Amino acid sequence: MDKQTIKIQISCEIGVRYLIETTTKIEDIIGYNALFNSLQKCKKGVGWKSTTGYYIHNWNTELLKMEEELSDGTYQKRKPKFFMITEPKVREIMSIHFRDRIYIRSFNDNALYPQITRSLIPDNFACQKGKGTLSARERFRDFIRDFYRKNGIEGYALTCDIKGYYPNMNRKFVKNMVTQYVDPLTDKLIQAEIDYHPGDIGFNPGEQTIQNIGILALNKMDHYIKERLRIKYYIRYMDDFVLLHPDKEYLEKAHCEIKNILKTQDMALNPKKTFIQPITNKIAFLGYDYRLLDTGKVIATVKPESITHAKRKMKRMMLLTLKDKRRKRDVDVYFKSWKASLRF
């Protein structure tokens, strides 16, 4: 069967059989109410687009049709579209049809996300409710302050970045990994979702399911660092993470251990972005440079490239606005959100 048109077999009989084994109910994923709630979330900010306008206008008919197709196993996801972005780096992004996004949102919000997040460490900050870049930056700043109170300025930081995080993910590893964290029904659906993505190695970031896989993929490493290596000051945001410790040799040991763990997942650290340095040096994390002064004060400054990126994006958006291909409101919203992200 063509992976692009793979059928997601989730008949009501299958759902009933799994009710005995799991807390996830099929109605919580493909029921009308679940799909309606998902639609309300998916249409935010995109209702003006022509590609979604028809579906939103005929939402009741379309939701009933989707519910029926999902129940009898005739639902087929449409072929995704691909496009390139150049900022902050050149990469290909996959975009799925609005109709399919509704099912994906319902599946993730009502089944996958609640199950995988139960086992995550508190200092894993990516793509989770109540977390994000702002809270991650605040947490990292608090880490540095607390480190100073206990160790002074004598310490080191191991900054790490994974080379090609999503593109290099091992599909077989991901399938086996997810099975360990979810119930049988959710596992059946997530396996179908993984098979839907084209290619044999890696994933294309641009879909909620893959983002959730990205949250979970390094969970084993997270627990190893926190519980086996007992490094208190460890924080991760997707594939960027930092470890603070007073002993440089211990961080070198941790570096080797991390490389070994990643090797079992066919991943590797980016040598250009992975290094150990004194804690008083500038430590880069999530678009900011952190500097610990002798007095214990922590100075956080926006990285110059982050400002350059924002200026370029606003310039492109304004050019599209002048050509009537973009609304001026979108530029204002982006500027306000970017400005707000600088406050912490």
PLM feature spans:
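Conserved polymerase palm-domain catalytic core
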Residues: E62, E69, E138-M238, V242-K259, ...
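Active-site-proximal segment of RNA-dependent polymerases
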Residues: D2-K7, E13-R17, E21-K25, N110-P167
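Reverse-transcriptase-like RNA-dependent polymerase core
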Residues: E69-K89, I102, D183-Y196
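Non-catalytic, polymerase-adjacent accessory regions of viral genome-replication enzymes
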Residues: M1-L64
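Short Gly/Ser/Thr- and Asp/Glu-enriched loop/turn motifs at secondary-structure junctions
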Residues: P80, I235-D239, P271-K272
